């Protein structure tokens, strides 16, 4: 569906932004590897229909591999990683990213519960309404995460440009 294509495109952009930052800027490399790896695992999960062509549920193994690969260098350099993560939590973009993740991982799941809709609408339950609200909440969360990633990218580049003068 169009909604899923947009969500997958947004996730791809988020992954690209964080891996680009990790590749170009050593100052926050391990933090960006972790964030990019997390969103890569989420992207793989969103692409589950594609991975089901290989074998049903195979997305799990690809997501696990992506997560493990994203953990290697940050774990090896754990002190730098912790310092970078602490720095990231002090940016305004961290709060926006967390808000987006809450919308995706918590609220969209709550709004997607059939029992909730049956309790609210009783006999007037229509599945399409539940799907629209659930996917809308998820899309909103992805857009918050993309906005946070773009904002972080721009702020990070400006900060480095100022330090180079």
Q: Where are the model-predicted features located?
A:
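C-terminal transmembrane-bundle signature of multipass membrane proteins
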Residues: 106-119, 133-162
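Structural signature of hydrophobic alpha-helical transmembrane segments
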Residues: 1-10, 30-33
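C-terminal ends of transmembrane alpha-helices
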Residues: 42-52, 103-122
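Hydrophobic alpha-helical membrane-insertion segments
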Residues: 19, 92-107
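Membrane-interfacial loop-to-transmembrane alpha-helix junctions, especially the N-terminal start
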Residues: 26-37, 92-98
């Amino acid at each position: 569906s169009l909604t899923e294509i947009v969500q997958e495109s947004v996730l791809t952009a988020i992954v690209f932004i964080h891996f680009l930052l990790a590749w170009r800027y050593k100052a926050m490399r391990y933090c960006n590897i972790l964030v990019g790896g997390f969103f890569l695992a989420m992207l793989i999960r969103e692409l589950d229909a594609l991975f089901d062509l290989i074998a049903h549920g195979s997305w799990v193994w690809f997501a696990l591999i992506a997560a493990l690969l994203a953990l290697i260098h940050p774990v090896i350099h754990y002190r730098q990683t912790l310092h970078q993560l602490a720095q990231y939590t002090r940016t305004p973009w961290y709060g926006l990213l967390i808000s987006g993740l809450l919308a995706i991982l918590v609220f969209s799941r709550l709004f997607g519960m059939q029992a909730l809709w049956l309790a609210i609408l009783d006999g007037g339950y229509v599945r399409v309404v539940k799907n629209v609200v659930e996917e809308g909440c998820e899309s909103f969360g992805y857009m918050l995460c993309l906005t946070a990633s773009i904002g972080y990218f721009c702020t990070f580049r400006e900060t480095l440009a100022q330090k180079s003068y």
